[in-house]
Amino acid sequence: MDQPEKPTSRREFIKQATGAFAGMALANTLAQATVFNAHSAVYALPLGVCTTYDKAGLLKRLGYSFVEESVGKFLIPDAGDEQYAKNRLALKAEAVPVRSYIYFFPGNLKSVGPDLHHEAILQRADLALRRAKECGSQNIVFGSGGSRSIPDGFDRAKAKAQHIELCQKMAPLAEKHGVTLAVEPLNRSETNFINSLAEGVEIIQAVNNPWFKLQCDIYHMLKDDESPDEIVKYSDYITHCHIAEKRNRTAPGVEGDDFKPYFRALKKIKYQGGLSLECRWKDFDQEITRGFEVVKKQLAEV
């Protein structure tokens, strides 16, 4: 029978984990530096998948560079601090970076409307950003469409002012912890506020903090017929990207969508950040394998 492991002291854990996460940050930097040469005919990006971290080993074997996890599962899990500590141990063991996070906060924490929860949101943001830094991560995606949906009959200008006020308080937290917040425009079927890159940039310009930037989700752009030219127009703000097919949010390769117009725009602006598959899955293993091949091929063709 295996002997039980000796419990690791908090000091020992922090010492061991810090070294591991520093190594992953360096690996991230090297991958980003080598993946795209502006003078090369072949365009490539670090690819990841929005999924749970237990899939990290599989993603690594397939050629993916990172996992994109969930704030509510990885950084602030329902099971509490003990589960977060286990998540960090898994991160150290697999050594596959968690570059970014989705599901920042739930829809019942409202950023706009008559009943605000700004203080609770800021407390959650501070904890999530601190832990993201501990994990060597670069971004937290600020989508949370339910939270920012404007209630029927509520003044839109007032809602926008409320949201900007919250973001102006949140951006210094991102700066303090050294983790970028990426505002994510969502298609109109998911929320009625911040539906385009232009609308996202309005918020970013009002906040005016370099740690508060823009998420470019090609799926949402496709759903609302948003032109790839918008990527070029707002290139200075884009820090991270997502992708899925238009009709059913399937993985690239399931229905055969052509993403090359959007990839050309990313290449034109010399984008070198991450690109994550955020999809609905039927056969995860098969679809991430095919998705990697399709995205890599289409990137190389632009």
Region locations from a protein language model:
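Active-site-proximal loop/turn and secondary-structure-junction residues that shape catalytic pockets
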Residues: 51-55, 71-73, 104-107, 146-148, ...
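N-terminal small/glycine-rich loop or linker at the start of catalytic domains
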Residues: 36-39, 100-111, 146-151
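Histidine-acidic metal/acid-base catalytic patches
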Residues: 2-46, 51-65, 136, 194-212, ...
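Mid-chain, structured segments of secreted extracytoplasmic proteins
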Residues: 87, 91-118
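Active-site acidic/histidine proton-transfer and metal-coordination neighborhood
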Residues: 17-19, 23-26, 110-213
